[in-house]
């Protein structure tokens, strides 16, 4: 199964992905984690990624797709993949389709986590205070949210037309959101 967890920054995608990894053995492909690791490496690529992330921009499709392709190859025997933070653009969605088709696979389910902007800001402020993530400062978060609405939200109708989109209320407790995701997974199986 190939599952996309979709929603704005701080919607809880990473939290839910980690739970699915533990409970179902899926492999989480978090572009955010991959990009933060590249950033921390201090490599030339990492420095380019850091500059883009610090400005609240989106890393180029070329870089992100290369990271995803590498992980699909390394983890080829996995029972399923959770794409967390990817795709973010129509171009990335098309590239993901091509990558999966070349492996005789496809996107099986897209779960869109809906959280209002006020709650997102509360969550990201708390996360910034607790974890100090550079991309969670208020100014950067505001730019990330704008980019989400401009670049990523247009994916909703595309996946809805394919019949693979399920929208859930991401404002409940972690357990309540988990229950909604589990129900969506059962329906799509």
UniProtKB/Swiss-Prot annotation:
GO terms for molecular function: adenylate kinase activity; ATP binding. Pfam families: ADK (PF00406). Consists of three domains, a large central CORE domain and two small peripheral domains, NMPbind and LID, which undergo movements during catalysis. The LID domain closes over the site of phosphoryl transfer upon ATP binding. Assembling and dissambling the active center during each catalytic cycle provides an effective means to prevent ATP hydrolysis. Pathway: Purine metabolism; AMP biosynthesis via salvage pathway; AMP from ADP: step 1/1. It is found in: Cytoplasm. GO terms for cellular component: cytoplasm. Its EC number is 2.7.4.3. Catalyzes the reversible transfer of the terminal phosphate group between ATP and AMP. Plays an important role in cellular energy homeostasis and in adenine nucleotide metabolism. It comes from the Bacteria. It is an enzyme of class 2 (transferase). ATP binds at residues 10-15, 127, 172. Monomer. One of its GO terms (biological process) is AMP salvage. Its main location: cytoplasm. PROSITE patterns: ADENYLATE_KINASE. Coiled coil: none annotated. Keywords: ATP-binding, Cytoplasm, Kinase, Nucleotide biosynthesis, Nucleotide-binding, Transferase. AMP binds at residues 31, 36, 57-59, 85-88, 92, 133, 144. Residues 30-59 are annotated as: NMP. Belongs to the adenylate kinase family. This is Adenylate kinase. InterPro entries: Adenylat/UMP-CMP_kin, Adenylat_kinase_CS, P-loop_NTPase. Residues 126-136 are annotated as: LID. It catalyses: AMP + ATP = 2 ADP. It comes from Hyphomonas neptunium (strain ATCC 15444).
């Amino acid at each position: 199964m190939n599952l996309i967890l979709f929603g704005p920054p701080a919607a809880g995608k990473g939290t839910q992905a980690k739970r699915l990894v533990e409970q179902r053995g899926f492999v989480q492909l978090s572009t955010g984690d991959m990009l933060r690791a590249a950033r921390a490496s201090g490599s030339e690529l990492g420095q380019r990624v850091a500059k883009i992330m610090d400005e609240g921009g989106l890393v180029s499709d070329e870089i992100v797709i290369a990271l995803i392709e590498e992980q699909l190859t390394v983890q080829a025997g996995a029972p399923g993949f959770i794409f967390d933070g990817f795709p973010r653009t129509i171009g990335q969605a098309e590239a993901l389709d091509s990558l999966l088709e070349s492996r005789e696979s496809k996107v099986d389910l897209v779960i869109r986590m809906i959280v209002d902007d006020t709650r997102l800001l509360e969550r990201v402020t708390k996360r910034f205070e607790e974890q100090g993530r550079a991309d969670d400062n208020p100014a950067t978060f505001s730019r990330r949210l704008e980019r989400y609405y401009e670049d990523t939200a247009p994916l909703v109708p595309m996946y809805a037309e394919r019949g693979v989109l399920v929208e859930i209320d991401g404002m409940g407790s972690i357990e309540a959101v988990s229950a909604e995701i589990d129900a969506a997974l059962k329906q799509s199986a």
